[in-house]
Each structure stands twice: as structure tokens, then as C-alpha cells.
Amino acid sequence: AAENVAIAARQSEPLLDMKQRTTHEDPNFMETFFRASRLHYIGTWKHRYEAFLEDLPPAPKLPAPRGGPGGERVILHVDMDCFFASVAALGRPELAGLPVAVSWSSAGGGELSSCNYLARATGCRAGMRIARAKEMCPNLIVMPYEFERYSAVAIDVYRLLHELSPHVMGVSVDEAYVDVTGLDGDPVQIAEDIRERIATKTGCAASVGVGPNRLIARLATKKAKPDAAYHVTATSAA
């Protein structure tokens, strides 16, 4: 049943037709090749995110650090866990509890773009060839790219982040920084609250690192993963 889900998803996306992707006899070869590529998606996502921002009011001035001059800022680094693979499983109960990866191809020479944690536990990693991944994980389900689904979930996530704070810096479709210095409350609880909102709204998990600046917040995310929050203060980072 899970394999049938992957086949149906691939067949529903004409850009992933193997003939279009591999033969120069198709006059639209170059167009379809780039439209089906991850790099093309990254570019189009940037334009979509910029359009999303245009509908928002200008962000006010950043609040002062907590505790006044010399105090710390509170920065969240929000990083969606195994984003492409997580979105692939949404609304597909057949994939629950199974190792899932994403690749433009289902053939052995294709390269994995994203793997869920069940797949990673077997040794599968992004950048690995499908043939090698299947040797390590014979029941691996390889889903196709589904760019519209990624964008829809990402916009939902960014809406939640902008509801939390107007000071959001988008990094990519699955990663952002949020300055929540002006919010009252424990920083870890703020992080846990936004994680819960994201999970409830999208069905996807996010890990959140908390720190006094973007660098430390990002390092904290490494401790938070998978699916948790972690706070590193300037003192503890020293």
C-alpha cells in the first residue's frame, strides 16, 4: 500500500515523468528539467515568500534586550524536522511508521533529498543514492518532490511565526529566526508553545533552538533535534 502511494504521487506530477527528464528529443526538455529541480523550487519559493511579506505591515523597531542595556536578546531558530519527508507523509496513513525519503527519481541512481528519522536510523542520509539506501533499508519508501505541498505548509508555518513576533527572518522554506525579546515568559516555554502551534496547524514537527543571537540559537537547535526545544544562554555558551 505504501509503495502504491509513492507511485500514485509520482504519476500525478507530470514534471517527474522520466522521459521529460532524460531525453533531449523533447522540445521542452530544459524547461521541464529545471521546473522539476530543487534549485528551481528554492528560487520560486523566495518569490512566494517575498509576496507573502508584502501583505504584512512593516515590522516595528526591535525591543531593547531583556534586562535593559547589556541584557540578552531572545532569538528562536525554528527548523522543521525532515521537512520534505514529513510533508510527504501528511494525509497518507499508509506511510505512518515507515522509513520515508524524498527524491526526484525512484531509480537507483537518484539521490535522496530528505529522509525521516526512521530512515536515518538505518543509515540513510540526504545525498545518498537510492540504490545504496535500499541496500541499507529495503522497505524505504521513496516519495517524489511535491513542491506545492511544501509551499503551502511553509506559508502556514510563517504565518504562525509572524503571529508570534513581527521580527521574523526567513532563511528557507523550512528554517527561520524569530526575535521574541519583547515577549514575556520563559524562553523555552515560548519555544515549546510555537512548536505546539506548528504541529497542530501543519502536522509537522519543528525543533527550536533558543539563544541570545542567531549563531547560538542555531547551535542550540542541534541539541534540540529531533522534535524538541533547547536554550543556550550567553553564559552557558562561553
Placement of each model-derived feature along the sequence:
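Residues that scaffold, gate, or flank divalent-cation-dependent active/transport sites
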Residues: 2-173, 177, 183, 194, ...
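Long, highly charged, low-complexity intrinsically disordered interaction regions
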Residues: 186-238
